[in-house]
Curated annotation (Swiss-Prot):
Residues 246-431 form the GATase cobBQ-type domain. InterPro entries: Class_I_gatase-like (IPR029062), CobQ/CobB/MinD/ParA_Nub-bd_dom (IPR002586), CobQ_GATase1 (IPR033949), CobQ_N (IPR047045), CobQ_synth (IPR004459), GATase_3 (IPR011698), P-loop_NTPase (IPR027417). Pathway: Cofactor biosynthesis; adenosylcobalamin biosynthesis. Belongs to the CobB/CobQ family. CobQ subfamily. HAMAP family: CobQ. Pfam families: CbiA, GATase_3. The active site is at C325, H423. GO terms for biological process: cobalamin biosynthetic process. The gene is cobQ. PANTHER family: COBYRIC ACID SYNTHASE, DETHIOBIOTIN SYNTHETASE. This is Probable cobyric acid synthase. One of its GO terms (molecular function) is ABC-type vitamin B12 transporter activity. Signal peptide: none annotated.
Amino acid sequence: MSLMILGTSSHVGKSVTVAAICRIMIRQGISVAPFKSQNMSLNSYVTRDGAEIGIAQAMQAFAARVLPSALMNPVLLKPKGDSTSQVVLLGHPYKDVQIRDYYQETDHLLEIAVDAYHQLVEEYGAVIVEGAGGAAEVNLYDRDIANIRLAEHLRLPIVLVADIERGGVFAQVYGTIALLPEQIRPLVKGIIINKFRGDPTLFESGVKTLEDLTGVPVLGVIPYTRLDLPSEDSLSLQDKERQTGLVRIAVIRLPQIANFTDFELLERHAAVDYLLPGESLDGYDCIIIPGTKNTVNDLLALQASGTAAAIRDARGQGVPVIGICGGYQMLGKTVIDDGSEARKGTYEGLGLLDLVTTFEGYDKTTVQVQRTAAPVPPILDAMGTVSGYEIHMGTTVLKSGRTAFAGEGAVSDDGLVFGTYLHGLFMVPAAAEALLSYLYSQRGLTFTGIEEQNEDPYDLLADHFEAHLQMERLLTLCSDHTPETPV
């Protein structure tokens, strides 16, 4: 009882569609798990057993009310720049590869992915498979282990998702189906039109046109909605407009920014802007340097753009500066690379904390943690015990000063500069409230507290899809599926 969700392009809503279907199915008592054979993302999540997967698959697992597992995302590609990506295989670092070399390994990786899928089927019964990017990338058909080659092996019913907000939805859908290989085209059993602005009934003639053109039923027209769910990739950063608010926070949009979902709770209560290196930091109440897949290269980008100097100037004016993971490493005096991170050498950090980070070998830390913040005012002392996860290479040694959390991180004497390896810190309400309360107080204001979500966002998502999706018809597709002989 499984289904494959493909898209006409990236960012059409495949991930949230899978999450919605998973939550709808589990609410109906159907055991289900998500699966994406290959994901390319710098936003990742660490499972309970220390495996690293794409954050979208973790989100989908939560929607399905199951624990995230490396089987749900057996191949994760984390771009490092210069056409190089780190390959995370079944949750653990495999190797760094050039894209051209990666394509030489797709047969091997596909075998691993198919095996992971079958393990999920055995454990959960139903699996909702998500493709990657656009399904009709004809130049990649022979090595596309997330869409076409996977579809050839699994022979699942396919539902195609298109984003009408972008325009050209008829060409998107018709063109994608027409370009699919002959043996895959008959597997397309349904179409979902996503992100419709306005009354979906106004698109009834469009639905008929699409069905006449393709011979495939449209299973739903999903109106555009905003929900508090994690974003998967940096494309979503391009959709974020400059914010206005009582308190302004600058998050440096590093070239290889990773896990920017760390700040989505802050975005609900402050004006959080993601600024490229070189953009002005004037007028911001706090500066956050986020995680990165390449600390050395992004540190050099900060220095070359003048942002490193601007951060030091802001610190001199009393603006809090916070570093998360790679950003924490940059706050130190020195970064030493044996060549495993980027290029061999010793690099000057921002010098705001007395610490040294060394990259040596290919060891990677991936672990869920719980830590107590140091009793250092005016921010950390209000956090208490927090939880999150570490995903990093390199080791950091604090030469002098205090740790920010029990046994980890660093904080300045005045408490206004601190760094930690802890991803997810500001998704903890107490931590976000501690920071926001201080920032509001500096403006002569009182922060009224983190707004509690009374309803589960996954239930809200499922309700939204159920209202506009022919779910019974879609479940029938799943139920009617019997594996065919792979081509």
